[in-house]
Every structure is written in C-alpha cells, then in structure tokens.
UniProtKB/Swiss-Prot annotation:
Keywords: DNA damage, DNA recombination, DNA repair, Metal-binding, Zinc, Zinc-finger. This is Recombination protein RecR. SUPFAM superfamilies: Recombination protein RecR (SSF111304). Residues 80-175 form the Toprim domain. PROSITE patterns: RECR (PS01300), TOPRIM (PS50880). GO terms for molecular function: DNA binding; zinc ion binding.
Length: 198
C-alpha cells in the first residue's frame, strides 16, 4: 500500500525494531500520528535521552546511566560470584527474583559460528581480565538454552577451567530455546539453586 512519505518513513523506522513486523509497524506509526503533540514530544525526548545518557558499565558491561553501575558499586553484594548473561535484560530478570546477590558480567552477545560471531566479538576479554587477581571463586553461566548459548557456555568453561575457577551453569528448568528474560521468577530461582558444575 502506498502511504504518504512521512508515514512510510515512520513505518520503516518501527519495522527495524526486533519482533516488529510490517503490520505492527503500520499500527504503531498510525497510533503515533494520533497521539497528542505533547505525548509525541515526550516520546521523542525520552528516546533521545535514553540513547544519549545510557552507557555500558566499564566493569560488568551492563547498560547503565552511572559508571560503574549501581550493582558493581554495591558493597553488600557477594564478590565471590559472577553470573554471566547475554544482555542487560537478563540482569533485570535475575534481579527481579531478589535471590541472587553476587555480581554480573554482560557479554553483549553470544558466540555464534553460523553468524560469524567469535569470542573476540563479545564482551569476554573483560570477564577474563576481571577474574585476574579477584576474589571470585565461581562463575555462573546463565546464557539462554540455545545452540549459541551452549556454544558460549562451553567456550567460557574451557577458558576458565585451567584457572581453577568453579564454573557452573543454570539448571535446566528453562526450556531449550527459551530466553531468560521471559522466564518466570520461580523458574529462575530454581535454575540458580540447582545450577550444575561444568
């Protein structure tokens, strides 16, 4: 269908978001046009502010507005454990259960040989650097139960084993192919409690 150029551009912009197809992008574009000028300005302002003000924590790699982030600077956290996740959304999911009190490391991606993504393409070197001369005695791998998540998990385990650091993996309460960010709190709690050593 032929839309006026401004609407077509808006549809194109929305369709670049993950999980947004052409129909949803069209609905969002038309809804945005129907919003009040004040709401559209607030939306645009918030979007620009988030893009401008957010950065990655120089310690853990989590998306934050403070560097280092609030978790890395919290002295009450257990500094002997680091939970490794794919992205910042996974940290939020784990924090919701209010059970894990250790630190995090965000990989900002997964090793994916099929997509040409290797260990050097994700935030892995900084994890290894963090572990040198630290009090960490356990690294808990909490990547998603996908082929790329498993490949990443096995790689991290192989790299860290010679250093004598205990490497564990979340227990299988998470269905294969599922994302941590969508798991319910009870499933995540059981996965942490029943983690297995690699």
């Amino acid at each position: 269908m032929l839309y006026p150029t401004p609407i077509a551009k808006l549809i194109d912009s929305f369709s670049k978001l993950p999980g947004i197809g052409a129909k949803t992008a069209t609905r969002l574009a038309f809804y945005t046009i129907s919003m009040s000028d004040e709401d559209v300005n607030d939306f645009a302002k918030n979007l620009l502010a988030a893009k401008r003000e957010l950065t990655y924590c120089s310690v853990c790699g989590r998306l934050t507005d403070d560097d280092p982030c609030i978790i890395c600077t919290d002295e009450t956290r257990d500094r002997t454990k680091i939970l490794v996740v794919e992205d910042s959304k996974d940290v939020s999911a784990m924090e919701k259960i209010q059970e894990y009190r250790g630190l995090y490391h965000v990989l900002q991606g997964l090793i994916s040989p099929m997509n040409g993504v290797g260990p050097d393409d994700i935030n892995l070197k900084s994890l290894i650097a963090r572990l040198m001369d630290s009090e960490v005695d356990e690294v808990i791998i909490a990547t998603n139960a996908t082929a790329d998540g498993e490949a990443t998990s096995m790689y991290i385990s192989r790299v860290l084993k010679p250093a004598g650091i205990k490497v564990t993996r979340l227990a299988r309460g998470l269905a294969v192919g599922s994302d941590i960010e969508y798991a319910d709190e009870v499933t995540l709690l059981r996965a942490i409690e029943n983690r297995t050593e690699l």
